[in-house]
């Protein structure tokens, strides 16, 4: 009975070992498939990231070129407006100076006319009146021209103020857009760093450092180590069960089983080897 039980347990252990080997083979195949899928995904992610970086760089370059072009155009327009205002101011000063000179001339001529009226005859009076009318007409034309120039000057100054305000607002919006872009970029980088696991980092660094042959060698050694570890755990568990059975359930198991399993010569060798630690009961069992 005991021999049949031992044979049955041996068969069970062999079948369990075979099942374990099959399971480990299946796990190895599944791991290889998963590793291939992970490598494909990583390649795809790297490709997508490179494409995103290229497109983003192109878009940012185009936006910066457009913004620089618009700012340069606005600055050029502002410079032209400033030059126009300076020219109009110079023209206004010359016109004011000429008007003051004309007013002085008119006052002088009016004084002369009054003096002539008092001293000269009627013909000279008519000539002076005609000249005075001509001078008044030219003065009116110059005054109209001065009003026109003043209106243009006011319009140009208003345009300059509006342009400066628009440029200020445009610069503020540009700063806001730059800050928002920097914040978005930082958020993306932080989310990437948070989402990445330390194990994934090590895995990616190892993938970047090592060659495919080194990767496969490492994986194979890891798998062998795992298999050996699990097998040793299994045998340690079996030995612990055996020790528990011999210690607490059936202490005479070895005494009953050894003579049936081993021959007399092997039992004699065991007796010689384990003689100091043998009890009287087992010593009586062994051959003399």
From Swiss-Prot:
Membrane topology listed for this record: Single-pass membrane protein
UniProt keyword annotations, A-Z: Coiled coil, Endoplasmic reticulum, Membrane, Nucleus, Transmembrane, Transmembrane helix
Principal cellular location given in the protein's record: endoplasmic reticulum
Keyword Zinc part of the UniProt annotation: no
Localization per record: Endoplasmic reticulum membrane; Nucleus membrane
GO cellular-component term (any): endoplasmic reticulum membrane
Keyword set includes Transmembrane: yes
Segments forming a coiled coil: 10-192
Superkingdom to which the source organism belongs: Eukaryota
Pfam families found in the cross-reference section: TMCO5 (PF14992)
Matching InterPro entries: SMCO2/5
Family per similarity comment: Belongs to the TMCO5 family.
Annotated PANTHER family: TRANSMEMBRANE AND COILED-COIL DOMAIN-CONTAINING PROTEIN 5A, TRANSMEMBRANE AND COILED-COIL DOMAIN-CONTAINING PROTEIN 5B-RELATED
Protein name: Transmembrane and coiled-coil domain-containing protein 5A
Provenance organism: Homo sapiens (Human)
């Amino acid at each position: 009975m005991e021999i049949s039980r031992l044979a049955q347990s041996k068969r069970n252990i062999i079948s369990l070992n075979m099942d374990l080997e099959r399971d480990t083979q299946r796990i190895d195949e599944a791991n290889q498939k998963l590793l291939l899928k992970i490598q494909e995904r990583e390649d795809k992610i790297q490709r997508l990231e490179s494409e995103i970086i290229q497109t983003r760089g192109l878009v940012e370059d185009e936006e910066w070129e457009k913004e620089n072009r618009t700012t340069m155009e606005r600055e050029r327009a502002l410079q032209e407006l400033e030059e126009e205002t300076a020219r109009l101011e110079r023209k206004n000063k010359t016109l004011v100076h000429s008007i003051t000179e004309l007013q002085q001339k008119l006052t002088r001529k009016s004084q002369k006319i009054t003096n002539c009226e008092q001293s000269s005859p009627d013909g000279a009076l008519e000539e002076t009146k005609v000249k005075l009318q001509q001078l008044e007409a030219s003065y009116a034309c110059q005054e109209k021209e001065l009003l026109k120039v003043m209106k243009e000057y006011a319009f140009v100054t208003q345009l300059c103020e509006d342009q400066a305000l628009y440029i200020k607002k445009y610069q503020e919006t540009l700063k806001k857009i730059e800050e928002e872009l920097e914040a978005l970029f930082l958020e993306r980088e932080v989310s990437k760093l948070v989402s990445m696991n330390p194990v994934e980092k090590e895995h990616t660094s190892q993938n970047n450092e090592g060659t495919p042959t080194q990767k496969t060698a490492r994986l194979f050694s890891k798998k062998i180590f795992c298999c050996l570890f699990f097998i040793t755990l299994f045998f340690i568990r079996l030995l612990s069960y055996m020790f528990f059975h011999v210690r607490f359930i059936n202490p005479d198991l070895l005494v009953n089983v050894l003579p049936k399993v081993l021959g007399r010569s092997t039992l004699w060798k065991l007796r010689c080897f384990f003689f100091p630690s043998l009890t009287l009961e087992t010593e009586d069992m062994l051959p003399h």
